[in-house]
A protein has these predicted regions:
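Transmembrane beta-barrel domains of outer membrane proteins
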Residues: 37-41, 67-71, 103-107, 141-143, ...
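Hydrophobic, well-structured mid-protein blocks that either form specific transmembrane helices
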Residues: 63-109, 116
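Transmembrane beta-strands of outer-membrane beta-barrel pores
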Residues: 29-33, 52-58, 70, 83-89, ...
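Repeated loop/turn-to-beta-strand initiation elements of outer-membrane beta-barrel proteins
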Residues: 44-50, 73-79, 110-116, 144, ...
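Cleavable N-terminal export/targeting peptides
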Residues: 1-24
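Short glycine/proline- and aromatic-enriched beta-strand/turn motifs that initiate or cap beta-hairpins
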Residues: 18-70
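Residues that define the transmembrane beta-barrel architecture of outer-membrane proteins
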Residues: 30-34, 44, 58-64, 77, ...
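Outer-membrane beta-barrel "beta-signal"
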Residues: 144, 171-184
Length: 184
């Protein structure tokens, strides 16, 4: 059993127990990576979320995150901006940090079921702990709304981190993936 499986089960159980209102479940898979994200609103326009990304791109790396975001979703756009704590457990080093970032998607006027956009988070060295110096996550996706509650997507993700014992930033994930997002 992979070492991240208990974390995945724990995050899922905590999230399921804490959400009585609408939320989302997002799962994506690539050749060398799997990611699961869960989110739930806590007030009008504010959502909390948690997730895990396990990548075997070059070395073994597991990243857990928790976030709070200001969010807005309507027929034209889907955006969120906020803070995210990311904890790294990698072959290069371990540590965590508080980053800022968000996501933004625009629905195409001539194809209203299709949206394009991306996301990014940056964690500077001033907001890190352990061996982590800084990290950067960026990605892009093309999404298709199969139903009002189900999106499918194709995306690209790149995550880098700089650790104390390394000479330069390390790429922890660099992958194309496919995924599904369920909203309930």
């Amino acid at each position: 059993m992979p070492r991240w499986t208990p974390l995945l089960v724990g995050i899922t159980a905590l999230w399921a127990a804490s959400t009585a209102q609408a939320g989302s479940f997002d799962l994506n898979l690539g050749d060398n990576a799997i990611e699961l994200n869960l989110a739930a609103p806590i007030a009008e326009g504010i959502a909390i979320g948690a997730g895990v990304l396990h990548s075997e791109y070059r070395e073994d790396a597991t990243m857990l995150h928790g976030q709070i975001m200001g969010v807005e979703r309507n027929r034209r756009m889907d955006i969120g901006v906020g803070a995210r704590w990311t904890q790294f457990n990698t072959d290069y080093g371990n540590g965590g940090g508080l980053g800022l970032g968000g996501y933004g998607y625009v629905y195409l006027p001539n194809a209203p079921a299709v949206s394009v956009g991306g996301y990014g988070f940056f964690t500077p060295s001033v907001a890190t702990s352990g061996k982590l110096d800084d990290s950067f996550l960026a990605g892009a996706r093309v999404r298709y709304d199969f139903t009002p509650t189900v999106d499918g997507y194709v995306g690209y993700r790149r995550m880098t981190a700089d650790f104390d014992d390394q000479r330069s930033s390390r790429t922890l994930d660099n992958s194309v993936h496919v995924g599904v997002n369920l909203r309930f």
